[in-house]
């Protein structure tokens, strides 16, 4: 049995559970517990804080984790990304007061930057030869310049609305993040097989999004005409019907063409 760590609450938690269910992995979270077991697939779900998930996977407390790539970059240690899941998109960016001119990265020399991601920020600054003071803040990073705690911030940005409401502007996009599936890399053969099954199911869910199953009954003498105009992922399936001279045409098509 595999143990998968996911975020205990929040949008990423709900989207992770939705993906698991779409992949046929049913999890009862009506009485959200620390640990729950799937009724349809040999996995346990471990609910943790998002910043604890990489460490839990690295230490073998969980076999896999679903977490934002930003957390892997900040705290990942010895874990590897085995699948990108296509939801929870955001970025980690540098932002400054909107009234300030921004000439480039030299702006940050000698400045105080508030962040919850000191490791990522430190690496970025060192790579670009910038000398700044990093102030680590656990939450509400965006208010730091307003209250005089910093000159700039380095924080998660989704739509940018929070920055605008706090009088800030985004000037450098450093890390692009989304939900990823991570592994510690020390899985048994049995667990590796389960991981491959999960990845196959997740991929099938992604491929099916935006698709519709199209079925039509058609006279046999019009099959070739229909095949020419019906879009398909590959080639439509044609099956004979009980009524002579008629067939059933099946195809998977993009929802946008219907």
Predicted regions span which residues?
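Small-molecule-sensing regulatory modules
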Residues: 1-42, 69-80, 85-91, 98-258
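Short beta-strand and adjacent tight-turn residues that come in two discontinuous sequence segments
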Residues: 48, 62, 66-67, 154-157
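Short, structured active-site "lid" loops
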Residues: 42-61
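Short glycine- and Lys/Arg-enriched binding-loop motifs that mark or flank ligand-binding interfaces
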Residues: 56, 61-64, 106, 163
């Amino acid at each position: 049995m595999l143990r998968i760590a996911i975020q205990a609450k929040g949008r990423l938690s709900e989207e992770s559970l939705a993906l698991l269910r779409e992949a046929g992995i049913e999890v009862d979270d009506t009485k959200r517990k620390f640990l729950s077991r799937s009724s349809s697939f040999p996995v346990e779900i471990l609910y943790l804080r998002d910043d604890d998930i990489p460490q839990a996977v690295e230490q073998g407390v969980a076999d896999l984790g679903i977490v934002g790539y930003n957390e892997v970059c900040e705290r990942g240690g010895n874990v590897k990304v085995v699948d990108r899941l296509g939801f929870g998109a955001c970025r980690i960016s540098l932002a400054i007061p909107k009234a300030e001119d921004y000439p480039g990265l030299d702006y940050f020399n000698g400045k105080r930057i508030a962040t919850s991601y000191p490791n990522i920020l430190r690496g970025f600054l060192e790579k670009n030869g910038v000398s700044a003071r990093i102030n680590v803040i656990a939450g509400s990073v965006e208010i730091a310049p307003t209250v005089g705690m910093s000159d700039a911030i380095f924080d998660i940005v989704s739509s940018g609305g929070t920055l605008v409401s706090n009088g800030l502007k985004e000037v450098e996009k450093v890390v692009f993040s989304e939900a990823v599936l991570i592994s510690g890399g020390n899985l048994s053969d049995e667990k590796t097989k389960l991981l491959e099954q999960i990845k196959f199911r997740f991929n099938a869910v992604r491929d099916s999004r935006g698709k519709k199953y199209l079925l039509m009954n058609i006279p046999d003498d019009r099959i070739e005409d229909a095949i020419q105009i019906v879009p398909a992922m590959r080639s439509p399936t044609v099956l004979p019907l009980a009524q002579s001279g008629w067939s059933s045409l099946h195809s998977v098509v993009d929802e946008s063409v219907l």
